[in-house]
A protein has these predicted regions:
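Conserved catalytic/binding loops enriched for acidic/polar residues
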Residues: 467-866
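Auxiliary tRNA-acceptor-end handling modules of aminoacyl-tRNA synthetases
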Residues: 27-329, 347, 351, 356, ...
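The catalytic-center signature of Zn2+-dependent metalloproteases
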Residues: 46, 361-382, 444-501
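Positively charged n-region of N-terminal signal peptides that target proteins for export
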Residues: 1-6
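Sec-exported extracytoplasmic/periplasmic mature domains
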Residues: 342-353, 455-456, 460, 496, ...
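Bacterial N-terminal signal peptides
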Residues: 9-19
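Boundary at the C-terminal end of the N-terminal hydrophobic targeting segment
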Residues: 20-25
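Extended catalytic-interface subdomain
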Residues: 395, 401-409, 447-458, 500-510, ...
């Protein structure tokens, strides 16, 4: 057995002990180092600025969108904006657009319920403030006089929202602030939901716990924030609640856009041309008076080669208007969409500008392209069951410069086109007698719709007077229609040629490529004047002379779309020709023929749903013809004209035409029911509801609702058709059979008498409150109540007043009470009808007819004996 030396054993023991002590020492030193490092880390954190801590702490889930305009950071469900210091005080636009919604009746995708608002960010103490910029006043910025300073005090900005500052960058070049509350919660300036649904008023209760941010994007000159919200919606009207606490989820996209550093030279408006406007107050340097003027909305089109333009040669523009077409459009739509955009180049070429309007597909190889980027104007496909399209735009409120424009095309617009083509042209065109339009017809129809919407994005409003420039005979002429189409402007609501009859061979049924008025409007709005050096006052004088040269030609007449006050029969929607009566009669003849052949032409429709839709459109079209004739009473033609032209600004139709229209409605109201073919009622579900009976009831009421309107026209022209003459005609026609001692009345004759007595009673009981003409409110009638107001509006015409006219040319207001004596007129006829009934009842043998007369008499007694 081997023996171990005691000293060796001792050494081994000592080594082990020493070794363990070293390890413990190392651990101790390590712990001290960690503690020291943590202490140093805490000290470093304490020395970091709040800005630095934001970007270094809890950043795992942070999403950022960075750009030269501004940056957005989404962190822990909070949204922060980082704005360059140099951008404070810069003017921007902000707006909110509905992106999607659970119920499209409560908000339209792609729609802004309020226009873009000019804003700027400023720093006040320890917060950032968003101000609504008041740029209504235009003045010479070099004028430092006390007068200007005092005037500017009436045009101050509005503080809209304040944001807490999170931090400042170390170099002082940017400010970080919390914008969560502003974007996540409902803002009264940016309502996403509509305010009304039919007769119901909408109110909503937001659910903040269900709101969240969805997207943040930042680009060179703009940025977007996407938000999803949920609200409980309640619909209320005078009869109660239609909905209560109805849950609705919707997405909103907020967009911010930097305005151009150098404003565009504006162009003053002219009420004789159809441009959208932005209103300004100008402080005139010559007399220090403030004058309200309007600038038109238009794109900044600067020629590349000004010398070529001066020589009368075509030149391109520095920045063309490019529309990008959504990839989501069905392939068979795309050709028509692109052709509709490019139509407008023909108008720009007339003023020397080439390839102004361009169209491209959404780019595949451009990583910066984004349809939400306001740098790009897009034609968007909206897959929602809405039969519509629209062309909204963003513009600089300082000058009217259009910066971005989009065309929103809803998927069911195809349904509208199919129905229009069938109902308006099937009497002559076999190609439209099908459930689905052919590719060629679809392309042609879409091209027209898109061209109209692109016209809006170019700044053009509707011109509802255009179609009244052509006669019925012209619309039935092959040579005329192939050259001029159905209207001088595609910005009118004049569709296809419903006047043309089956015997009119070779007639064109289509609207024009572009009308004469469209070329004229583009020339007025976009013509470049190289020698006037961007002097908008000098340009305005030249342009006024240009318009005056065309003033007497109906082809170049602009008729504003009538909203509240509807007095002018020559400026209405969905009409053709200068003769509504003749056009309506021809249109009704065509609709009758189409209705008779509906089953024969549409055979692949086992459930009759499509025929039901077409039949509904037929009735709507027919009602439109009646309404166009109804507008001839009072028949006040409104024109925006210069005094030097000698053309009256308002002119009442001849008395004979007014009376003809009034009597036509009474005599032909019964004809509407002829569209209610019993063979259709038997197998088309919609027709089985007998809607034509309901429409006819409305038409019967329409025949006697002209007293108040005639009071207006009679006020302007004492030689025109008077309210008393009208009531006498209505009375003589409606009670004519009774006056002649008829022993039997038709259903229509009974309904007319019943409607007339109801009208008389309503007038006696409620006066002007409930008895105003259809489409006219008693407190919103038309034209100036002061004889000198019109003179003042144009008194400075020869002295170079800023622009021509006032705004868009909407008629001034006239309080109905000043001229409307409906109650006075109807009292005498209520007494007259009562006397007739008292004489007639004793000698009426038919029990049913006698009961009818007694009912009318009882109603009149109740009103007259109060």
């Amino acid at each position: 057995m081997r023996r171990h030396h005691p000293i060796l054993i001792l050494l081994l023991i000592l080594t082990g002990v020493l070794s363990g002590s070293t390890a413990e020492a190392q651990i101790l030193r390590s712990k001290r180092a960690v503690a020291r490092e943590r202490q140093e880390q805490r000290m470093r954190e304490q020395t970091k600025s709040p800005y630095e801590r934001f970007f270094t702490t809890d950043t795992t889930s942070m999403r950022s969108a960075q750009g030269p305009f501004l940056s957005l950071h989404l962190k822990e469900k909070q949204l922060y904006m980082e704005l360059p210091s140099e951008s404070f005080g810069e003017e921007m636009l902000i707006a909110a657009t509905v992106s999607d919604i659970s119920n499209p009746q409560l908000g339209l995708p792609g729609f802004k319920n309020s226009g873009p608002i000019p804003i700027r960010f400023i720093q006040k103490d320890s917060v950032v403030v968003m101000e609504v910029v008041n740029n209504d006043l235009l003045y010479n910025p070099t004028d430092k006089s006390a007068l200007v300073k005092n005037i500017r005090k009436s045009y101050t900005n509005v503080s809209l929202h304040k944001f807490p500052i999170t931090g400042l960058s170390s170099d002082g070049k940017s400010v970080l602030f919390d914008v969560t509350d502003f974007f996540l919660n409902e803002q009264r300036f940016f309502d996403a939901l509509v305010s009304e649904v039919g007769s119901y008023r909408l109110s909503s209760s937001p659910r903040p716990d269900l709101s969240s941010f969805t997207t943040v994007k930042s680009f060179e000159t703009n940025a977007t924030v996407g938000v999803e919200r949920t609200s409980y919606v309640t619909l209320t009207n005078s009869r109660g609640k239609g909905l209560e606490d109805y849950p609705t989820t919707y997405s909103v996209t907020y967009s911010l856009l930097r305005l151009p550093a150098v404003p565009m030279t504006p162009r003053l408006s002219d009420t004789r041309v159809n441009f959208f406007l932005t209103e300004k107050d100008i402080l005139r340097s010559d007399n220090h008076q403030i004058e309200t003027v309007n600038f038109i909305r238009r794109w900044r089109l600067e020629p590349v080669d000004m010398e070529a333009l001066k020589r009368g040669e075509l030149t391109e523009v520095k920045k063309p208007i490019i529309y990008y077409v959504d990839d989501n459009f069905p392939e068979r739509w795309r050709a028509g969409i692109k052709a509709g955009v490019l139509r407008w180049n023909k108008a720009f070429e007339r003023i020397g500008l080439k390839d102004v309007v361009q169209v491209r597909d959404f780019p595949k190889d451009d990583p910066e392209f984004d349809p939400d980027n306001l740098k790009y104007s897009c034609i968007r496909y909206v897959p929602v069951g809405i039969e519509n399209a629209m062309g909204p735009s963003w513009y600089d409120p300082r000058t009217g410069e259009i910066i971005n424009a989009s065309v929103m095309v809803y998927s069911n617009v195809i349904k509208t086109l199919n129905n229009w083509r069938f109902v308006q042209t099937a009497q002559l065109d076999p190609a439209v007698r099908s459930k689905v339009l052919s590719d060629s017809l679809l392309t042609e129809s879409l091209e027209y719709v898109i061209a109209h919407e692109v016209g809006h994005t170019l700044g053009l409003m509707h011109n509802m007077a255009a179609s009244a420039a052509y006669s019925v005979d012209s619309l039935r002429s092959p040579s005329f229609t192939h050259k001029y189409g159905t209207t001088p402007s595609i910005m009118d609501y004049a569709r296809w040629n419903y006047v043309t009859q089956r015997e009119d061979e070779g007639v064109s049924l289509d609207p024009p490529f572009l009308g004469a008025f469209d070329y004229y409007a583009i020339e007025w709005g976009y013509k470049v004047f190289p020698d006037l050096e961007d002097n908008f006052l000098a340009e305005s004088k030249v342009l006024q002379e240009f318009v005056s040269r065309h003033e007497g030609d109906p082809i170049y007449r602009y008729g504003v779309q009538q909203v509240e006050s509807r007095l002018d029969p020559s400026a209405i929607e969905e009409d053709l020709s200068d003769d509504p009566i003749r056009a309506g009669e021809l249109g009704m003849r065509n609709l009758m023929y189409i209705t008779e052949h509906l089953d024969e032409w549409i055979t692949d429709d086992p459930g009759a749903e499509h025929r039901g839709e077409l039949y509904e459109q037929i009735l709507a079209q027919a009602y439109g013809y009646y309404h166009n004739i109804f507008m001839m009473v009072p028949g006040i033609i409104l024109r925006q004209t210069s005094e030097s032209s000698g053309i009256p600004r308002h002119q009442v139709l001849p008395k004979e035409r007014q009376r003809e229209a009034a009597l036509w409605l009474i005599e032909h109201a019964e004809d509407f029911r002829k569209l209610g073919l019993e063979e259709l009622v038997g197998h088309i579900p919609y027709a089985s509801l007998r809607p034509f009976d309901l429409v006819q009831q409305d038409l019967l009421k329409m025949t006697m609702l002209n007293t108040g309107k005639l009071a207006i026209s009679y006020y302007f022209d004492p030689d025109s058709y008077s309210p008393m003459e009208y009531l006498e005609d209505v009375y003589s026609h409606i009670f004519g059979p009774t006056l002649r001692g008829a022993s039997h009345l038709s259903e229509t004759e009974i309904a007319l008498q019943d409607a007339f007595v109801r009208y008389l009673n309503a007038s006696l009981q409620y006066g002007l409150q409930n008895v105003y003409p259809v489409g006219l409110k008693s407190d919103a009638l038309s034209l100036s109540y002061k004889a000198d107001k019109t003179v003042c509006n144009h008194a400075g015409e020869e002295n170079g007043l800023l622009g021509f006219g006032n705004g868009n040319g909407f008629p001034e207001h006239l309080w109905a009470q000043t001229v409307n004596m409906t109650s006075d007129y109807t009292l005498s006829y209520a007494l007259k009808v009562r006397d007739l009934l008292k004489r007639t009842i004793p000698r009426t043998r038919d029990a049913n007819l006698r009961a009818h007369y007694r009912l009318l008499l009882g109603r009149l007694d109740k009103s007259l004996d109060k």
